């Protein structure tokens, strides 16, 4: 999920390449990576974003499996980045449930519901 956020910034918002080593082996290192990713997202200057460019310019996603084209940054976000985030979030949720961690739907969807 960290890479998805990072690559959104570089592929869609055209920020300079950002290197995250992908070699974390402890929870502390993973927590530091999460903090670094949040810092990257917070560093985006919202006033410099060109909504038309994000909405209209194609995005090429270069991967080891080949290159993939999205018609726009909006398409990249809605058809790849958000579904990829939810895939990994639900996978982690299912693994935790399988291992007996006492979590439920409200732990996953807690921010969606506002009790009245």
Predicted segments — roles?
Residues 1-15, 67-107:
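Short, contiguous alpha-helical
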Residues 6-71, 96, 109-116:
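Aromatic-glycine hotspot motif
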């Amino acid at each position: 999920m960290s890479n998805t956020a990072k690559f959104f910034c570089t592929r869609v918002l055209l920020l300079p390449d950002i290197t995250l080593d992908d070699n974390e082996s402890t929870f502390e290192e993973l927590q530091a990576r999460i903090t670094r990713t949040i810092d990257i997202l917070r560093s985006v200057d919202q006033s410099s974003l060109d909504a038309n460019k994000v909405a209209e310019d194609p995005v090429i996603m270069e991967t080891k499996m080949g290159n993939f084209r999205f018609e726009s940054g909006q398409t990249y976000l809605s058809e790849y980045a958000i579904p990829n985030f939810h895939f990994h979030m639900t996978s982690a949720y299912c693994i935790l449930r399988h291992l007996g961690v006492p979590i439920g739907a409200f732990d996953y969807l807690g921010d969606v519901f506002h009790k009245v």
